[in-house]
Amino acid sequence: MKLTDNVLRSFRVAKVFRENSDKINCFDFSPTGETVISSSDDDSIVLYDCQEGKPKRTLYSKKYGVDLIRYTHAANTVVYSSNKIDDTIRYLSLHDNKYIRYFPGHSKRVVALSMSPVDDTFISGSLDKTIRLWDLRSPNCQGLMHLQGKPVCSFDPEGLIFAAGVNSEMVKLYDLRSFDKGPFATFKMQYDRTCEWTALKFSNDGKLILMSTNGGFLRLVDAFKGAVMHTFGGYNNSKAVTLEATFTPDSQFIMIGSEDGKIHVWNCESGMKVAVLDGKHTGPITCLQFNPKFMTFTSACSNMAFWLPTIDD
């Protein structure tokens, strides 16, 4: 089944889970798309089975809190940042609920975490104005970059380069093998003082970069030239909430939730709005991702909603 405008318009909420007492701050699909794991401000980690559409397990990180949860490549392991006490990144085995390793180094809250799509490398960005490069096998930081402001960062789909958005006004591209030589490309964007960048994501084909903000718009950037291709707006975000935006796996569409529980969908190429879907969420949709392998996506406030198309195209 192929994603088309009509298929996207047909998506409806199939199941809603109310496992959390506070907002879900992050979730991540396993590479196979078979499970999704969430982190919440209520200090819980909930694992869902996407094929059966039900929660499987709940774990807790009461002491440190949990945010920015990410699957690693090993089965049943995740990394996540803390939102209490310290700013250490933790590597957890879900199998026996034990920490495998800690990654200390950041002195302020971690605001970005990206796992390499190809190996055990990951990067983190923090309010301490640094990006750190890590290897899951070592607690020691493998590389450190000092920046001029708050960073957002992400690997490209090949895992060869990573992009850093700095101070909500420039995007720097680094070669992973020689990042200490500085960026090989820098794209300066128009600075908008009304909001700041909250995330940066590559499309699966590596051609596009999506800049999320805590304002009422998103920017779609050409990953090679740095030109802004489209600015998407027209969704509600009056309280400057961090709303997650996402590409569909075919790199053809962009989706974002809003503070009023609706999901807005645009065509990447034309820039046209394709659909507005009502998720009936009780709060702002802080998390939204399309499943990497199956025709389903998930949105979250303090509830998790699983969506399915209602037509066979």
UniProtKB/Swiss-Prot annotation:
InterPro entries recorded: G-protein_beta_WD-40_rep (IPR020472), Swd2/WDR82 (IPR037867), WD40/YVTN_repeat-like_dom_sf (IPR015943), WD40_repeat_dom_sf (IPR036322), WD40_rpt (IPR001680)
Cellular localisation: Nucleus; Chromosome; Cytoplasm
Gene3D superfamilies assigned to the protein according to its UniProt record, in alphabetical order: YVTN repeat-like/Quinoprotein amine dehydrogenase
One GO biological process term: RNA polymerase II promoter clearance
Record keywords: Chromosome, Cytoplasm, Nucleus, Repeat, Transcription, Transcription regulation, Transcription termination, WD repeat
An annotated GO cellular component: PTW/PP1 phosphatase complex
Main location class: nucleus
Pfam families xref list: WD40
Family: Belongs to the WD repeat SWD2 family.
Self-association state and partner proteins as the record states: Component of the SET1/COMPASS complex. Component of the PNUTS-PP1 phosphatase complex.
Function, in words: Regulatory component of the SET1/COMPASS complex implicated in the tethering of this complex to transcriptional start sites of active genes. Facilitates histone H3 'Lys-4' methylation (H3K4me) via recruitment of the SETD1A or SETD1B to the 'Ser-5' phosphorylated C-terminal domain (CTD) of RNA polymerase II large subunit (POLR2A). Component of the PNUTS-PP1 protein phosphatase complex, a protein phosphatase 1 (PP1) complex that promotes RNA polymerase II transcription pause-release, allowing transcription elongation.
Protein name per Swiss-Prot or TrEMBL: WD repeat-containing protein 82
Lineage, broadest ranks: Eukaryota, Metazoa, Chordata, Craniata, Vertebrata
